[in-house]
């Protein structure tokens, strides 16, 4: 269900049509992936829903590259093409020694978005992180993800696991997830409706462990924890204990 026209040169790539891209270093939570991100709880991530877009890439001699994306959308109310419904983004990917980094500049649904991502080796493990700033009608909002991943071999089976902390700047600052509480957070509701966000809280911890049972079969349990709910429950129980 994807049709696009592509040109690939020695250092340049141009594509126009239905396609999918993934940006950022988050494995479960992806604040920098502003175009059709995966639900963190998605089981099958082999196929990603795409957008009708223009994509361009320029590869430098040192391995760094620049990517640009333009997505034109219509206003669902009047059917007109509008800049406030469209997206234009440029991302620079570079190497600094053994480290990698990304710089993002975008105009997304009429809002300016800046992003910084980095990954590096940390004692044999891989550290990854994204920091994203969005200039909304309600002011500046930051979102971030940081994670640590490690791979090893036990009993001739390949294992890998990672731990991620996610700060969702658009999420509820407290544990009020009622309809009235969510209605007071239109920035969150807009992103939920557009399929850009899947979490309504603010602080999350996610972890995953994969074991390769056979070359064609692997087992991957994931755990997601809403830290606000956990701490609120702990505080209530502790308060009840100390009160008596």
Each predicted region: which residue ranges?
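Transmembrane beta-strands of outer-membrane beta-barrel pores
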Residues: 9-11, 20-22, 72-74, 96, ...
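Residues on the lipid-exposed face of transmembrane beta-strands in outer-membrane beta-barrel proteins
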Residues: 2-7, 54-58, 90-94, 116-120, ...
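Repeated loop/turn-to-beta-strand initiation elements of outer-membrane beta-barrel proteins
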Residues: 11-14, 63-66, 96-103, 124-128, ...
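Residues that define the transmembrane beta-barrel architecture of outer-membrane proteins
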Residues: 1, 8, 48-52, 84-88, ...
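Detector for outer-membrane/organellar transmembrane beta-barrel domains
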Residues: 125-227
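Outer membrane beta-barrel
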Residues: 1-65, 71-73
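Membrane-embedded beta-strand positions of outer-membrane beta-barrel proteins
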Residues: 16, 56, 68, 103-105, ...
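Outer-membrane beta-barrel translocator domains and adjoining extracellular loop/strand segments
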Residues: 27-33, 78-84, 113-116, 139-145, ...
